[in-house]
């Protein structure tokens, strides 16, 4: 009974193993190791021989459990599910992609327009996806308004007769103010209305050196004092 069970299970295993290849089936039938399948050792030896021959004749590809050749191209299967590593006519080689890129550039610039320099191309491509990466154009400068231009325009707008009338109607106080301003423009500007400006001569040093005696040199004062003291001692 156990021998019958062993032989039956061995026959089933052998049938499943030999289903994959008809050539191996015929070779196993003709092999001397598979002639007697009554014992367990002969059965295992036949299975090993058939399995070894199957692995040598039929290549085993990774990823298929039935040990059959892949139906699709292995090169396409390797990284085809990634967007940046697809194999194709455009990205098959670096030389092909460079040639195609060069042909596209020639088609774009074929109308006679000057081709941009590589530095400009790099500058436009390097940071164009950032808002602050684009090269800044000319800065807008504020418009300067010159008072002389406004005066000239007003002078052109008024005739000569009206200008004479306006000059004759000027008050006296305004003329004096204008004259004083003109004098100030000629000389140096003094900050007289501030406290830290130069004080008048009569108020310098607290009024100590305002008299004529104060203008005498200090050596003369000491000399006079010494002479007076000597004269008093001599009396």
From Swiss-Prot:
Which positions, given as ranges, span the membrane?
none
Residues with PTM N-acetylserine: 124
An example of a Pfam family matching this protein is Op_neuropeptide
Region Disordered: start-end pairs = 88-126, 179-210
Report residue numbers covered by any propeptide.
103-121
List residues, modification Phenylalanine amide.
87
Record has Phosphoprotein as a keyword: yes
What spans are recorded as compositionally biased (Low complexity)? 90-100
Q: Which residues carry this modification: Phosphoserine?
A: 154
Tell me the Gene Ontology biological-process terms attached to this UniProt entry. Answer: calcium-mediated signaling; cell-cell signaling; cellular pigmentation; generation of precursor metabolites and energy; glucose homeostasis; negative regulation of tumor necrosis factor production; neuropeptide signaling pathway; positive regulation of adenylate cyclase-activating G protein-coupled receptor signaling pathway
SMART domains with a match to the protein in the record: ACTH_domain, NPP, Op_neuropeptide
Signal peptide segment: 1-26
One GO cellular component this record assigns the protein to is: cytoplasm
Give the UniProt keywords, A-Z.
Answer: Acetylation, Amidation, Cleavage on pair of basic residues, Endorphin, Glycoprotein, Hormone, Phosphoprotein, Secreted, Signal
Residues annotated as carrying Valine amide in the record are 136
Indicate where this protein resides in the cell: Secreted
Q: Which PANTHER family match?
A: PRO-OPIOMELANOCORTIN
Instruction: Report the sequence similarity comment from the record.
Output: Belongs to the POMC family.
Q: What is this protein called?
A: Pro-opiomelanocortin
Species this chain originates from: Mus musculus (Mouse)
Q: According to the entry, what is the taxonomic lineage of the organism?
A: Eukaryota, Metazoa, Chordata, Craniata, Vertebrata
């Amino acid at each position: 009974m156990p021998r019958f069970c062993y032989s039956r299970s061995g026959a089933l295993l052998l049938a499943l193993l030999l289903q994959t290849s008809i050539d191996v089936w015929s070779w196993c039938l003709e092999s001397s190791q598979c002639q007697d399948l009554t014992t367990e050792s002969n059965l295992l030896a036949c299975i090993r021989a058939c399995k070894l021959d199957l692995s040598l004749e039929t290549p085993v590809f990774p990823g298929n459990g039935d040990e059959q050749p892949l139906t699709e191209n292995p090169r396409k299967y390797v990284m085809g599910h990634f967007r940046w590593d697809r194999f194709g006519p455009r990205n098959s080689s670096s030389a092909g992609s460079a040639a195609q890129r060069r042909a596209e550039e020639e088609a774009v610039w074929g109308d006679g327009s000057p081709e941009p320099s590589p530095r400009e191309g790099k500058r436009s491509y390097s940071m164009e996806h950032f808002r602050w990466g684009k090269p800044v154009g000319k800065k807008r400068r504020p418009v300067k308004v010159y008072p002389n231009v406004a005066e000239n325009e007003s002078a052109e707008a008024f005739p000569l007769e009206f200008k004479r009338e306006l000059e004759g109607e000027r008050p006296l106080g305004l003329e004096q103010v204008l004259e004083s301003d003109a004098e100030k423009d000629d000389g140096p500007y003094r900050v007289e209305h501030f406290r830290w400006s130069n004080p008048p001569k009569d108020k310098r040093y607290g009024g100590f050196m305002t008299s004529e005696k104060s203008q005498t040199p200090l050596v003369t004062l000491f000399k006079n004092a010494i002479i007076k003291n000597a004269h008093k001692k001599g009396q």
